[in-house]
């Protein structure tokens, strides 16, 4: 069966501002008439994401609103109950979307109240069927929703009652990044993300056993005139910068090495830790890694960096070895680079580029704590 939408722009207009020429028709090939509406819905979603790429912050999330349009984004990976959350909690709140919360720079939201894709069981097996918000008796979509809070959902059958708490900002960033679409295409993407996450004092974590028990917690965040922004964590933005690479390469950090940062796309620092976005990969740096990265803004000797660590974090009987080890991890991860070393012969960069990397996915010694693909969902 060929399912064609000859006026995709009109279908998207309710959720995406009509600020450009009409999109070309969407055509979806499907051999199953039951699955065809889901396939069409998915195609429209992908086109909507493409239209806002590089402009809007897009969460893979449920959007539910209060009476004045104050909207909470409930973020979680696919297959973990977001549609169930929308169908249950949306009966008492406004339904904005169950797929993609599209957040503009002023935190207004382009509503996308698509039909809900609900998994059903029949003789064929698991299928996804489209159910309208009206059929599910969800609340009306507000005309001008705006983001007021971002909540990471985490189902835990051992939790006796729902627990809504503030997340450390760095934890929230790393939890939400995999559930964004085309984040690196935004200008200063991590700063844009942090501004959204910190609304109402967030980001928030909601741990629960059954989503129907969470209505009060979610509704409280949408209540009119709620202002928790004063509780938001303080964070520092370090905009990306292009750094020159020396013609020669040193791979091993020694006490005579001179180091500085490599090119990075964006970075934020909070509570002594940081997230550095480089080559579309976010790396979380602990206090030690962050202090070294911040200190290496300009070319610095290992001795200078060591002294900075002692001054900011404190002394340690093995501080020199710990700093050398941490610097090596940061160099291996290409977060820092050695630009000179008078006591080590360099390797030509083209020869170094041919050597296999041994760093991907490394977790080490209080320096680089985690790395993951920042654009795992949509490029």
Language model regions located:
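Short helix-to-turn junction characteristic of helix-turn-helix DNA-binding domains
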Residues: 295-300
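GT-A fold catalytic core of metal-dependent nucleotide-sugar glycosyltransferases
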Residues: 93-97
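Conserved lysine of the Walker
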Residues: 82
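A noncatalytic interaction/capping subdomain that flanks phosphate/NTP-handling catalytic cores
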Residues: 1-78, 91-92, 102-290, 294, ...
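Acidic/polar hotspots within intrinsically disordered regions
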Residues: 366, 373-375
């Amino acid at each position: 069966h060929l399912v064609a939408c000859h006026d995709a722009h009109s279908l998207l207009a309710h959720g995406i501002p009509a600020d450009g020429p009409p999109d070309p028709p969407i055509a979806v090939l499907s051999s199953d008439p039951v699955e065809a509406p889901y396939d069409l819905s998915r195609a429209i979603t992908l086109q909507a994401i493409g239209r806002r790429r590089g402009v809007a912050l897009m969460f893979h999330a449920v959007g539910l609103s209060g009476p004045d349009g104050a909207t909470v984004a409930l973020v979680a990976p696919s297959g973990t109950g977001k549609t169930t959350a929308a169908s249950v909690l949306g009966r008492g709140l406004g339904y904005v979307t169950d797929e993609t919360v599209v957040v503009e720079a002023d935190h207004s939201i382009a509503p996308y109240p698509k039909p809900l894709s609900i998994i059903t069981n029949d003789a064929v097996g698991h299928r996804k069927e489209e159910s309208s918000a009206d059929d599910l008796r969800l609340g009306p979509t507000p005309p001008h929703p705006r983001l007021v809070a971002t909540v990471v959902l985490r189902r835990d059958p051992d939790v006796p009652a729902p627990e809504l708490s503030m997340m450390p900002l760095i934890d929230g960033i790393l939890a939400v990044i995999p559930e964004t679409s085309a984040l690196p295409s935004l200008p200063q993407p991590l700063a844009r993300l942090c501004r959204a996450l910190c609304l109402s004092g967030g980001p928030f974590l909601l741990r629960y056993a059954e989503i129907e028990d969470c209505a009060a917690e979610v509704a409280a965040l949408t209540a009119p005139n709620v202002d928790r922004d004063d509780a938001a964590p303080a964070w520092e933005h370090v905009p990306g910068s292009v750094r020159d690479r020396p013609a020669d390469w040193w791979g091993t950090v020694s006490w005579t090495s001179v180091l500085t940062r490599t090119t990075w796309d964006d970075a934020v620092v909070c509570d002594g830790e940081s997230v550095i976005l480089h080559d579309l990969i976010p790396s979380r740096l602990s206090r030690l890694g962050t202090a070294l990265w911040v200190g290496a803004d300009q070319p610095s000797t290992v001795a200078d960096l060591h002294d900075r660590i002692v001054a900011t974090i404190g002394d340690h009987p093995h501080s020199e070895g710990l700093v050398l080890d941490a610097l090596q991890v940061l160099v291996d991860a290409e977060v820092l680079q050695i630009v000179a070393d008078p006591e080590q012969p360099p390797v030509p960069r083209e020869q170094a580029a041919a050597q296999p990397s041994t760093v991907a996915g490394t977790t080490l010694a209080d320096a680089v704590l985690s790395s993951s693909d920042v654009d795992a969902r949509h490029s």
